[in-house]
Amino acid sequence: MRFLRFLKIFFTVIRFGLDEMMLSRVNDRRVRLLLRITTIGRKFDQPPGVRLRLALESLGPIFVKFGQVLSTRRDLLRPDIATELAKLQDQVPPFDSAVAIAIIEKSLGAPVDTIFDDFERVPVASASIAQVHFATLKIGQHAGKQVAVKVLRPNMLPVIDSDLALLRDIAVWAERLWADGKRLKPREVVAEFDKYLHDELDLMREAANGSQLRRNFAGLDLLLVPEMYWEYCTANVLVMERMVGVPISQVDTLRVAGVDIPKLAREGVEIFFTQVFRDGFFHADMHPGNIQVSLDPAHFGRYIALDFGIIGALSDFDKNYLAQNFLAFFKRDYHRVATLHLESGWVPATTRVEELESAIRAVCEPYFDRALKDISLGQVLMRLFSTSRRFNVEIQPQLVLLQKTMLNVEGLGRSLDPELDLWKTAKPYLERWMNEQIGAKGWYERLKIEAPQWSKTLPQLPRLIHHVLAQRHDAQQRGINDETIRQILLEQKRTNRLLQGLLMFGVAVGVGAVLARAWLAIAYGGY
């Protein structure tokens, strides 16, 4: 079976001329000679990106998904190919509703007719991973509620694991034979895709993501997120509140209904940056199919978010990297941008900041030939990643996911309002987050969180200092290889951060003690 699947992939590659695209970059002369022979008489009118998209579509939904993930890696692909892959549509015929009902009944342990009224056998939506049916809950505390029932496709795991095994084999060969193999890191891309697919196969995980997003926006008049009905959620079935809205792509319908379109565009950007900088938890699949707008008088003009299979998470370190990079970029302070990359610890310690600064200036300066409102933050981030790749920077998957989502949000906002000023909308969020981190309130909050750990580690400070100095001395004496030195330097940088924190804590404790004693002296007339 696996061999037959491999043959299909092989003949698809030949049919669409992908062998010409890939093997022309192979180092082996014999392979290049074979390529010349096999391409005699073949001519392709369509550009490479179109041929790659058509080939992935012909190979089925798993490869379509792979192409969609690949399209987000604009730090690796040529822009024309990435743009073409972004057109891939995850639309497949629905599976038999009788099979869907059998899965629901097995997962929930009861006949569908006892759980739901008016279960619609024709699915309202169908994709490669699951399909959705509308129904009304019949029992329990939510009886009478209209719901959407998402059902995982049957027997998906064996198919996915088989195709992933083939993709892993192809990635290994590509890395060995292809001149661009090491730069494009095919095994890394396939591993990322593996995680992405298996995350989507767990509907309990998706329900948890949706529940978290709903909780984050509770009390904010910005975004509606469906309630998850946990008693009816399993790994194969997800039952959530049915949301009624107009797809965001139907702009004319929204305008006729009286929705303020420019305001809608601004609020979309506000929702995104609230998720990124306030919560560090963002919906990472914000294409038009997953976004609607409510026309219900109680929630008129509010966004509705659907499908929570892909979620991104950012640490405070990630948020600081983003905020400082964007602020430095718009000040055209390229030295600061380069320094931030080095300080992140993701850049080899041997990198010269001046070289990185020069490369960043070369890709960023042309952006300022246009109005600030026309600058794409997603494109800026993408160009920074592409430049960083040349310096062997460790690309962070969470930031790549953010960059892809940012491009979607920008495209959505500008399709609603071509005059949308993304920087003007985003800047207050960046500055507010920076002020909260640097200001007294932010310092106090971090102190409350870190103080217990620091109090345990502070007595170890002399030993840590001795350990750092000994590491550097040993490295110089033993003449160890560059990679080991790089790892030691990275570890040293992390240790230095800890030492700085400990010293700050020690100073804070000392100053606090002095002030407390001074206050007692003033209050009680002496020590």
From Swiss-Prot:
Its main location: membrane. It is a single-pass membrane protein. One of its GO terms (molecular function) is ATP binding. Keywords: ATP-binding, Cell inner membrane, Cell membrane, Kinase, Membrane, Nucleotide-binding, Transferase, Transmembrane, Transmembrane helix, Ubiquinone biosynthesis. Residues 118-501 form the Protein kinase domain. Pfam families: ABC1. GO terms for biological process: regulation of ubiquinone biosynthetic process; ubiquinone biosynthetic process. InterPro entries: ABC1_dom, Kinase-like_dom_sf, UbiB, UbiB_bact, UbiB_kinase. ATP binds at residues 124-132, 150. Its EC number is 2.7.-.-. The active site is at residue 285. The chain crosses the membrane at residues 502-522. GO terms for cellular component: plasma membrane. Coiled coil: none annotated. Pathway: Cofactor biosynthesis; ubiquinone biosynthesis [regulation]. NCBIfam families: PRK04750.1, UbiB. This is Probable protein kinase UbiB. It comes from Paraburkholderia phymatum (strain DSM 17167 / CIP 108236 / LMG 21445 / STM815). The lineage of its organism: Bacteria, Pseudomonadati, Pseudomonadota, Betaproteobacteria, Burkholderiales.
